[in-house]
């Protein structure tokens, strides 16, 4: 439950208990009620009493959208409020940091911070929070830390930097709570060493409670359990328990060639075959810009979300997408390539443990060479397939199939949330079609069929099914020559120019105008991220679809207006008489040349 607008599906709700029965502070209960939460979810009804009454460390494994955020925020807030009541003599304006929340990405840090602000609305005088995950000058950070926030939200890397360079500004002697959210993703991002170093600064031997929240439980998490936890309570909420809610997600896969991916996208979005907002996932930043530029050729607007863009711009794009400003978002999900493991070992892990998904990555040298050409710095603390709260997504389109079954689960988890229906469509390139069209080729598609079989196997364990889907080729073929023209105009040079142009525009909006937008928030709404880049030549005629290409039922009925003469056939008698008189008068006149003397 990441915001007040998005409530957990009914399948997650625990009707047998209410928030009032959890003995929470009245101010916290008032904030919970204000945000529309009536009953806790399953994970909340189990975790909150264990944390508050029994003071247990907690390791929780639960699916996306089950209310994990509030499951740890409520105990943290309640514990701090209780501490303030019982230790009024220690509070002299120099309060200590009482809670630390670690998350893998900046986007998730901002999301948690937003939820926290809503929960401490009526106790903001007693609890202050600070999100240090965003880039800010050290002088600004130091001044913010002088306010002594009770809760600090950060990525492990940012917190480690703070402790190394400015540890005197943070007092951790009375730390009560440590939360590590999305633990498996934190470890995938390579923060294991940072966590070990952070542990040296924490009062682990005192009464420090730890929350480890994760989608999977693997050996790495077991190591963190030994390092951070003492006799923890382990909560597991399997997908089987909420499978009745999963039938709201319909999954399709389409076997197609590499070039036909672009053709199908053109047809789908130009003819409006998908109603509602669509989230498109690609595996590479260049792929995202190529798809955007190709769609621009046909007048289809979209916006880009990737790790190159400034953090402020990324957050603004997500916010506007959630407010329905954009309906088509192309997101680059390249975080799955950070951690590389042997595929065979992953297969063994899958057979030995049903709780742990396979983690496999592409070791293709060609893909690495392609990445070598990009000199623009990426933000390693960026993740889009997990954590980011995309609201009311009608369809998730895997333009590029993810390289792991685990990543597939997280991608499709962006739709069919909060009890709503959703559709997931995945393009799969058969091995026999791989490499036939060099300009549209991407190396990871070589393994699409293998990945698809693993995805189908994984989903079948959950009682879910991926259905094959095929388009009417006769209807699609009519659009092919137009796609060939549009695709030909999007060259590699055009893609590079588009990346540079987009980055310059977003940096300008993010840095130079940041203060202006803070003073004039109404003008921020007019800042758009789906403007046409078109460094490539845009052919205007491609933006309109001729009627003869449309299916019969989609063609606009033409009105039969009949023959339209240049002059009106019907004339009044008055006009006829006037014409006759004029002709007589003009005819009676003599020719001046003949009568000239």
From Swiss-Prot:
Motif mapping: Q motif: 17-45
Basic residues bias: start-end ranges: 568-587
Annotated ranges, domain Helicase C-terminal: 248-477
Pfam families, per database record: DEAD (PF00270), Helicase_C (PF00271)
Domain Helicase ATP-binding: 49-235
A GO biological-process term: rRNA processing
Catalytic reaction(s) noted: ATP + H2O = ADP + phosphate + H(+)
Domain notes: The Q motif is unique to and characteristic of the DEAD box family of RNA helicases and controls ATP binding and hydrolysis.
Family the entry assigns: Belongs to the DEAD box helicase family. DDX56/DBP9 subfamily.
PANTHER family according to UniProt: ATP-DEPENDENT RNA HELICASE RHLE-RELATED (PTHR47959), DEAD-BOX HELICASE 56 (PTHR47959:SF21)
Protein's UniProt name: ATP-dependent RNA helicase DBP9
Gene name of the record: DBP9
């Amino acid at each position: 439950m990441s915001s007040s607008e998005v409530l957990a599906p009914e399948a997650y709700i625990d009707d047998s208990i209410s928030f009032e029965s959890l003995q929470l502070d009245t101010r916290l209960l008032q904030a919970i009620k204000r945000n529309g939460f009536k009953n806790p979810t399953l994970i909340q009804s189990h975790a909150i009493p264990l944390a508050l009454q029994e003071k247990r460390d907690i390791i929780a494994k639960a699916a996306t959208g089950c209310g994990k955020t509030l499951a740890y925020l409520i105990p943290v807030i309640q514990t701090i409020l209780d501490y303030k009541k019982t230790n009024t003599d220690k509070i002299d304006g120099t309060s200590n940091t009482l809670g630390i929340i670690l998350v893998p990405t900046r986007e998730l840090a901002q999301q948690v911070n937003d939820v926290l602000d809503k929960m401490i609305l009526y106790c903001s005088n007693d609890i202050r929070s600070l999100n240090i995950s965003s880039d800010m000058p050290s002088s600004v950070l130091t001044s913010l830390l002088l306010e002594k926030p009770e809760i600090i939200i950060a990525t492990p890397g940012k917190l480690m930097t703070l402790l190394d360079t400015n540890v005197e500004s943070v007092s951790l002697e009375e730390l009560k709570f440590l939360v590590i959210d999305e633990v498996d993703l934190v470890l995938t991002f390579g923060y294991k060493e940072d966590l070990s170093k952070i542990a040296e600064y924490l009062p682990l031997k005192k009464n420090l409670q730890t929350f480890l929240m994760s989608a999977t439980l693997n050996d790495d998490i077991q190591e963190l359990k030994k390092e951070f936890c003492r006799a923890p309570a382990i909560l597991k909420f399997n997908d089987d328990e909420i499978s009745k809610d999963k039938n709201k997600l319909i999954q399709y896969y389409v076997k197609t060639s590499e070039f036909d991916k672009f053709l199908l996208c053109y047809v789908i979005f130009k003819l409006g075959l998908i109603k509602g907002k669509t989230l498109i996932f690609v595996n590479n930043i260049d792929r995202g810009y190529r798809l955007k530029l190709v769609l621009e050729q046909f007048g289809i607007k979209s916006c880009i979300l990737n790790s190159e863009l400034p953090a402020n711009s990324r957050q603004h794009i997500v916010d506007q997408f959630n407010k329905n400003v954009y309906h088509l978002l192309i997101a680059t999900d390249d975080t799955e390539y950070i951690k590389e493991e042997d595929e065979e070992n992953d297969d063994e892990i899958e057979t030995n443990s049903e709780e742990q998904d396979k983690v496999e990555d592409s070791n293709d040298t060609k893909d690495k060479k392609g990445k070598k050409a990009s000199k623009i710095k990426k933000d390693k603390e960026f993740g889009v397939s997990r954590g980011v709260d995309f609201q009311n997504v009608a369809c998730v389109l895997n333009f590029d199939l993810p390289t792991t079954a685990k990543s597939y689960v997280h991608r499709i988890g962006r739709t069919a949330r909060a009890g709503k229906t959703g559709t997931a469509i995945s393009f799969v390139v058969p091995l026999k079609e791989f490499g036939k069209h060099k300009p549209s080729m991407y190396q990871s598609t070589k393994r699409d069929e293998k990945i698809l079989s693993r995805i189908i196997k994984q989903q079948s364990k959950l009682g879910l099914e991926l259905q094959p889907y095929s388009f009417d080729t006769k209807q699609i073929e009519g659009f092919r020559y137009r796609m060939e023209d549009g695709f030909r105009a999007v060259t590699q040079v055009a893609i590079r120019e588009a990346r540079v142009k987009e980055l310059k525009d977003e940096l300008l909006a993010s840095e130079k105008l940041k203060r202006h937008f803070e003073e004039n928030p109404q003008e921020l709404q007019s800042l758009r991220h789906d403007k046409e880049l078109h460094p490539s030549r845009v052919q205007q005629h491609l933006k309109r679809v001729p009627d003869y290409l449309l299916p019969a039922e989609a063609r606009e009925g033409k009105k039969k207006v009949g023959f339209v003469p240049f002059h009106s056939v019907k004339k009044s008698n008055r006009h006829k008489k006037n014409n006759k008189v004029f002709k007589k008068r003009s005819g009676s006149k003599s020719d001046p040349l003949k009568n000239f003397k």
